[in-house]
């Protein structure tokens, strides 16, 4: 088995809404990334969030909450994950490679934060990041972006930039918009990534977005966490719980200047049954449409050659026999028990 560490930190709070913490915790970048895993609208996050949004890292962070404003800024270092990442980090450290540093900040405006029935959220986030040592063994100045395309049961990462070498640093920037009224809520984010390279290589530019909405059918109330700047579990309209219908569209583009990691559109429809505060059932259907560059780093077929043979490289695809790429549906069911 492997070992990973999530929330483990010390915190000191001042009386004016300012507090600091140090340890291992999520970097504050984006609304979906700051949503607790038990409160996700769908079984998996949107592709752009899975690919770009940073999560748990060791660091130091300051937060200020005041009336309608939430501000967070932190400096972060290495990630504590499984055995593979641990081995990569150790081999790179022995070779004298730096573990990398990230400076991440987020600001959120919550103009009706005192109202429990309705609310509005407008946020921005930015992160300056140098390459980490967990991409591969003896692979300095290297980053990699990939995602499992809305299903973590599928181990193939069709969308994959492969290792990008000679990287100086990355810039992440994001915009967030959300709101709720009684049983209805909506949320959307746009994230862009500029990977700045050395040795005269062009900057690789990637981006993506998602929009999603949901409605509680039996009188429940959507809830929002002001301290997280994200939605939390709704309250229920019936003694037996509540049922929520949800829909999402997301797009990601990992095709840059020289790096072609693929692009994808995804549609997800979900039904959430909140049985108790601790028990939730989720049924999701997703339809994914990948382009011909989403070939899982050369492992997935993406079309046909002119002679009728299967093509694994995008440049081999004869578009007279089809545009190339993969389109498929995913049906998933989750039973979630929270403690």
Residue ranges and their predicted role:
Residues 136-339:
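Outer-membrane beta-barrel pore domains
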Residues 1-87, 94-132, 210-237, 244-246, ...:
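Outer membrane beta-barrel
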